[in-house]
């Protein structure tokens, strides 16, 4: 058997070092027909027909710096 990469004594060092943050109050997510409607509107209705490549579903509204 080969050895694992990195020792177990360093496991979890980043997570333990980050400060704890309280959970935010969020609206409950839509379910059922309302969720399907929201996804349909996001993909088809609100999408602007323009030039270039289609934006992916996981893209952010952050301008890219080239």
UniProtKB/Swiss-Prot annotation:
Gene behind the chain: rps30-1
Q: Tell me the keywords, alphabetical order.
A: Ribonucleoprotein, Ribosomal protein
The record, for Pfam families, names: Ribosomal_S30
- Family annotation (PANTHER family): 40S RIBOSOMAL PROTEIN S30/UBIQUITIN-LIKE PROTEIN FUBI, RIBOSOMAL PROTEIN S30, ISOFORM A
Spell out the molecular function terms from Gene Ontology.
structural constituent of ribosome
According to its UniProt entry, this protein's organism is: Dictyostelium discoideum
CC terms in the record's Gene Ontology section? cytosolic small ribosomal subunit; small ribosomal subunit
In residue numbers, the region (Disordered) covers 1-35
Q: What GO biological process terms are annotated to this protein in UniProt?
A: translation
InterPro entries registered for this protein in UniProt:
Ribosomal_eS30
The protein's superkingdom reads: Eukaryota
Q: Can you say what this protein is called?
A: Small ribosomal subunit protein eS30
Assigned protein family:
Belongs to the eukaryotic ribosomal protein eS30 family.
The regions listed as transmembrane in this protein's record are none
């Amino acid at each position: 058997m080969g050895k694992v990469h990195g020792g177990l004594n360093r496991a979890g060092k980043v997570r333990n070092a980050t400060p704890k943050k309280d959970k935010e109050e969020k609206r409950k997510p839509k379910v059922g027909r309302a969720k399907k409607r929201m996804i349909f509107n996001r993909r088809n209705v609100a999408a602007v027909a323009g030039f270039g490549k289609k934006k992916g579903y996981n893209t952010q509204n952050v301008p890219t710096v080239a």
